[in-house]
């Protein structure tokens, strides 16, 4: 069977990871990535053997920089079966007309609104609904992390309501322009934050409210999750449910911080120190008067990467069973 031809529009924090993950699959291949300028990320892509595409006006700049582009972004789009749009939040919507004109399928990231694609995706919760779709939005890192735990718990025990407090990393490790550096910022001030409503685009029946703040760290987000459940269960019951999820990792054995989780990612030789799984502290899982509480950490740079691969597989109908796609993706990337 011919491999699906994938192009990544925007080779940044998410795009470069999606490119590597898709290239690792046996049913898809990267036919090109796009960069607007010949910076260090473009140089690395060139060294890795990816064909680089650029805005037509910038092709000469790439040539002069010693990394000649294979063509324009429009030409890249024409060659692909699926475009994974990893451009900065709010930019991707301006590319929709280009994709529609070329007749290609497209995946956007969580920085875009649900309405742009009309379908928000999480592999565990709603894979089958994306089969054959032309446009899909993979929800954000935080929403992905919430869907991965809320969906199986709700399926096992039923959910009356969910309340989440998110301590969000201020920015990514390579970003020198954002902060805060020495402050805690309620973000947004007006509640709820967008994360709860965003979960409902994937799991509509969930009653969920969220509040978020930005804190001066770049490593990971941390969620405090509170769920009021419909059916009685114990903390051990919840541990068994979460422990059965291939994209949930229990972190114990003296791990008490996001810094130590990132050290684990280094020690197990993950590419770019990525932690694709939700990292749940099993000792934090507590039941009190029918309500569940636990902490989880989310690696914002990588958690959505396997989800993008599964979205490609669903849209191209390479696999009809979401559970099988998840296992296939996991095996190929080493999760």
Curated annotation (Swiss-Prot):
<dbReference type="InterPro" id="IPR020829">
    <property type="entry name" value="GlycerAld_3-P_DH_cat"/>
</dbReference>
<keyword id="KW-0324">Glycolysis</keyword>
<feature type="binding site">
    <location>
        <position position="169"/>
    </location>
    <ligand>
        <name>NAD(+)</name>
    </ligand>
</feature>
<dbReference type="InterPro" id="IPR000846">
    <property type="entry name" value="DapB_N"/>
</dbReference>
<keyword id="KW-0521">NADP</keyword>
<dbReference type="InterPro" id="IPR020831">
    <property type="entry name" value="GlycerAld/Erythrose_P_DH"/>
</dbReference>
<protein>
    <recommendedName>
        <fullName>Glyceraldehyde-3-phosphate dehydrogenase 2</fullName>
        <ecNumber>1.2.1.59</ecNumber>
    </recommendedName>
</protein>
<comment type="subunit">
    <text>Homotetramer.</text>
</comment>
<dbReference type="Pfam" id="PF02800">
    <property type="entry name" value="Gp_dh_C"/>
</dbReference>
<feature type="binding site">
    <location>
        <position position="111"/>
    </location>
    <ligand>
        <name>NAD(+)</name>
    </ligand>
</feature>
<dbReference type="InterPro" id="IPR020830">
    <property type="entry name" value="GlycerAld_3-P_DH_AS"/>
</dbReference>
<dbReference type="GO" id="GO:0009089">
    <property type="term" value="P:lysine biosynthetic process via diaminopimelate"/>
</dbReference>
<keyword id="KW-0963">Cytoplasm</keyword>
<feature type="binding site">
    <location>
        <begin position="140"/>
        <end position="142"/>
    </location>
    <ligand>
        <name>D-glyceraldehyde 3-phosphate</name>
    </ligand>
</feature>
<keyword id="KW-0560">Oxidoreductase</keyword>
<dbReference type="GO" id="GO:0050661">
    <property type="term" value="F:NADP binding"/>
</dbReference>
<keyword id="KW-0520">NAD</keyword>
<dbReference type="Pfam" id="PF01113">
    <property type="entry name" value="DapB_N"/>
</dbReference>
<comment type="similarity">
    <text>Belongs to the glyceraldehyde-3-phosphate dehydrogenase family.</text>
</comment>
<dbReference type="GO" id="GO:0051287">
    <property type="term" value="F:NAD binding"/>
</dbReference>
<dbReference type="InterPro" id="IPR036291">
    <property type="entry name" value="NAD(P)-bd_dom_sf"/>
</dbReference>
<feature type="binding site">
    <location>
        <begin position="195"/>
        <end position="196"/>
    </location>
    <ligand>
        <name>D-glyceraldehyde 3-phosphate</name>
    </ligand>
</feature>
<feature type="binding site">
    <location>
        <begin position="13"/>
        <end position="14"/>
    </location>
    <ligand>
        <name>NAD(+)</name>
    </ligand>
</feature>
<dbReference type="GO" id="GO:0006096">
    <property type="term" value="P:glycolytic process"/>
</dbReference>
<feature type="active site" description="Nucleophile">
    <location>
        <position position="141"/>
    </location>
</feature>
<dbReference type="InterPro" id="IPR020828">
    <property type="entry name" value="GlycerAld_3-P_DH_NAD(P)-bd"/>
</dbReference>
<dbReference type="GO" id="GO:0047100">
    <property type="term" value="F:glyceraldehyde-3-phosphate dehydrogenase (NADP+) (phosphorylating) activity"/>
</dbReference>
<feature type="binding site">
    <location>
        <position position="300"/>
    </location>
    <ligand>
        <name>NAD(+)</name>
    </ligand>
</feature>
<feature type="binding site">
    <location>
        <position position="171"/>
    </location>
    <ligand>
        <name>D-glyceraldehyde 3-phosphate</name>
    </ligand>
</feature>
<dbReference type="InterPro" id="IPR006436">
    <property type="entry name" value="Glyceraldehyde-3-P_DH_2_arc"/>
</dbReference>
<dbReference type="GO" id="GO:0005737">
    <property type="term" value="C:cytoplasm"/>
</dbReference>
<dbReference type="GO" id="GO:0008839">
    <property type="term" value="F:4-hydroxy-tetrahydrodipicolinate reductase"/>
</dbReference>
<comment type="pathway">
    <text>Carbohydrate degradation; glycolysis; pyruvate from D-glyceraldehyde 3-phosphate: step 1/5.</text>
</comment>
<dbReference type="GO" id="GO:0004365">
    <property type="term" value="F:glyceraldehyde-3-phosphate dehydrogenase (NAD+) (phosphorylating) activity"/>
</dbReference>
């Amino acid at each position: 069977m011919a491999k699906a031809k994938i192009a990544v529009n925007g080779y940044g924090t998410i795009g470069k990871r999606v490119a590597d993950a898709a290239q690792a699959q046996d049913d898809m291949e990267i036919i090109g990535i796009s960069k607007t300028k010949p910076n260090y990320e473009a140089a690395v892509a060139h060294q890795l053997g990816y064909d680089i595409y650029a805005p037509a006006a910038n092709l000469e700049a790439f040539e002069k920089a010693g990394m000649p582009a294979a063509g324009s972004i429009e030409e890249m789009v024409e060659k692909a079966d699926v475009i994974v749009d990893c451009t900065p939040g709010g930019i991707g919507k301006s590319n929709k007309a280009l994709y529609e004109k070329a007749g290609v399928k497209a995946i956007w990231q969580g920085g875009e609104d649900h309405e742009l694609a009309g379908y928000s995706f999480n592999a565990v919760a709603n894979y089958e609904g994306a089969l054959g779709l032309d446009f899909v939005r993979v929800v954000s890192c935080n929403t992905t992390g919430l869907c991965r735990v809320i969906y199986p718990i709700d399926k096992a025990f039923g959910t009356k309501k969910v309340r989440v407090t998110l301590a969000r990393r201020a920015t990514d490790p390579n970003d020198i322009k954002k902060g805060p550096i020495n402050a805690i910022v309620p973000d947004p001030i007006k509640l709820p934050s967008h994360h709860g409503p965003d979960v409902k685009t994937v799991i509509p029946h969930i009653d969920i409210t969220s509040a978020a703040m930005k804190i001066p760290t770049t490593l990971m987000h941390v969620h405090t999750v509170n769920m009021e459940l419909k059916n009685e269960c114990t903390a051990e019951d919840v541990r068994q449910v979460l422990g059965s999820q291939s994209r949930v990792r229990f972190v114990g054995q003296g791990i008490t911080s996001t810094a130590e989780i990132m050290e684990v990612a280094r020690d197990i030789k993950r590419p770019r120190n990525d932690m694709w799984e939700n990292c749940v502290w099993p000792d934090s899982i507590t039941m009190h008067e029918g309500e569940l509480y636990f902490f989880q950490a989310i690696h914002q740079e990588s958690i959505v990467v396997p989800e993008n691969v599964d979205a490609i597989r669903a849209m191209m109908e390479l696999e009809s069973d979401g559970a099988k796609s998840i296992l296939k993706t996991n095996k190929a990337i080493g999760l």
